[in-house]
Amino acid sequence: MIERSGYGIIAASLLLSAVAYLLHPLISALFVGFALFTAYFFRDPERKIGEGVVSPADGRIDYLEGRRLEIFMSPFDCHINRAPWGGKVLSVKFIEGSTPPAFIRKSGVRTNEILIETEHGVFRVLQMAGIFARRIVSYVSEGDVVKKGQKIGMIRFGSRVVLEVPEGFRFVRGVGEKVKAGETVALRDESFQGS
């Protein structure tokens, strides 16, 4: 399955490929290649939702301290982000900022902040744009009720997602580990079962 906003880019690439073929087959092949990359990038695989607090993004954990976990998403990771836990969306706020390369941890970055209120406290998900990831798309609005693993947004063409959690949780993944949105359990609290 492909995320809905990818279809327009794929269609435009294939149309340009047909027109470019009149100029030169090699130019046409470049557009076909871009269409194939776009189809791969905008893929929307089914996920089996994990039992604890789940990762909000696909990628590699590159920072973990206290109650904060950061995930670097390369252009080859699926870029659809998911709710780490079920609850009510308190707010969705876009914060303007710079767009450095996603592998560089930096403050003042273009960010979409999603706060999810749960029975165990507030989860904060930050979708951060990078130099190539210029567009952050949010699928949720203030007041929405989300389920754990539900799609909450997408960052186009690679970047970073941050998860900040309430007190009382312990991370079960470490720096360098690969995670999958909605599927990989990122942290647990043994005192209650998954929402």
Swiss-Prot record:
Site location (Cleavage (non-hydrolytic)): G158, S159
Active-site residues from the entry: S159 (schiff-base intermediate with substrate)
Residues the record lists as Pyruvic acid (Ser) modifications: S159
Mode of membrane association: Peripheral membrane protein
EC numbers: 4.1.1.-
Subcellular location: Cell membrane
Function according to Swiss-Prot or TrEMBL: Catalyzes the formation of archaetidylethanolamine (PtdEtn) from archaetidylserine (PtdSer).
Protein name from the UniProt record: Putative archaetidylserine decarboxylase proenzyme
The organism of origin for this protein: Archaeoglobus fulgidus (strain ATCC 49558 / DSM 4304 / JCM 9628 / NBRC 100126 / VC-16)
Gene that produces this protein: asd
